[in-house]
Amino acid sequence: MALNCSTPADVTKALSDNNIQFVDLKFTDLYGQWQHFSLPTDYYDEEDLFKSGLGFDGSSIRGFKSIESSDMMLVCDPTTAFIDPVCQAPTLSVIANVYEPGTYEVFSRDPRNVIRKAEAYMKSTGIADTMFCGPEAEFFIFDKVRYETGRYSGQYELASDEAAWNTGNWGPGHKIGYKGGYFPVAPFDAFQDIRSEMVTLMTAAGLKVERHHHEVATAGQTEIDLRFAPMVQMADWMQIYKYIVKNVAAKHGKTATFMPKPLFEDNGSGMHVHQSLWKDGKPLFAGEEYAGLSKMAVWYIGGILTHINSLLAICAPTTNSYRRLVPGYEAPVVIAYSARNRSAACRIPVSSQSPK
């Protein structure tokens, strides 16, 4: 449940009002994975969580610290508190920022601190006061997964009842062909109810969901779209989103994965992000240039394309990323910007005449 807390005192009150038994602190490692630990409410201390901080071993978190300088601190953001829809025991989750001990300097490799710093810089320039982001994350839901990497061997196998490669097996004949998964109804779309359960929990946690549907690929490719939000809030929402997706899938004995290209000869999963700058409540990217853009929007796109090689280290960080970035599978393989063309690195969608 969303709590709409703004102060530590609001969080303390929410613990009592909702008979919370545990407080769960969540933070993001360098690879984007959520980490956490939980406190019984008997040991909850408002000052510890929101001012002094709680310590942890940074050398055991990927990409953070070496063993000789391992101690780090977590200080929670009260505005992020929500009642965790995944936990069985009544649990309030709150997202934390990572700090250096003693000096309380923000930790430079904490992804949440990075985006907070970027937002603060944007505001300091006076160019814009808000950046809205609207990611469209895609993922697969597999029925079974097995993999092994041995010293002299390696293997993996994916199982999906709806997959095109199962047409030769006895059972229901409702299979989705390669590239045939975009928008079919049940019984071809076997994941309607699981997606709806995911959306229900996301909404309960405070996320704003616009739509959900089966995606293009066979074997349970899925998309759930969030309503756009300011950049830091959206970063938090996406962590909650992935947390709920993976846990709901696991509850049903399935595995959800956001890896870019798990299947050969079918579309991979991406997460393109709608972006817009606003100032004083007005959109700065609407104008009279190509595709209804303003000059600022064109310059903004130019900056992305100029630095696209460096951005790939963040946007396409694994070797599997490049298995997706090939022609013929609706992946952005051209360093260009274009209206409607899904092969362009920057696409201007044509869906409405509204400047918003």
Predicted regions span which residues?
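Glycine-rich, acidic/polar active-site loops that bind/position phosphate-bearing ligands
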Residues: 2-356
